[in-house]
Amino acid sequence: MLHAEFLWDFLTGIIHGSTISQAQEDIIDQIFDASDIIVEFILLLKKEIPNIKTYFCYGNHGRTTQGKSDAANKSNYERIIPAYVRKELRKNDIKVIDGGYEDFVTYKLRDGKLIVCTHGTNDHPDTVNKNFTKLLGENVYEIHMGHYHSVKEGNGATVNGSIMGSDDYSISKRFHNQPAQVLKVYYGNDDVGTFKLVLKN
């Protein structure tokens, strides 16, 4: 079973002036293109791994307003993408699961261990596992999150990299990273392999 997690940000969005001017597409075209790329990617995976479940949680780049304090959690362009992907994959036996209005989604491994997927806008990697364990009232085995655009692991959390690397905004804040993704393999009995896949064009 492959659990494919889409932790966002797949849209440049409208939250930073620099990324608006840097984007070569408006937000609507970004939604269509990102959705099509995700569908194509999932279908490529299915050719190699027949049993796939996909999980979507939205991030901060899809906010419908620039001001963070003005943004309601559910007012997010990225919520459109799983609906589009679900419709495109309806003739396949691929599950498309999203958190609805919540910015996280959960699933369990074969041995019953709880995994929480979240973008991470509202979380810190050092405390997120403890906070979700309290929130859900259940022991969380691992948190998988994005947002920080750099691979990190520890304290019951794995931070995924970004497929785009650094944009003008992140460079202006002196953040830098290589485009990368994380592949985790659960062998059983707490034996877990974590692989950092550095992306090159």
What is each model feature region?
Residues K46, S75-R79, Y84-N92, I97-Y101, ...:
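Conserved beta-sheet core of the metallophosphoesterase superfamily
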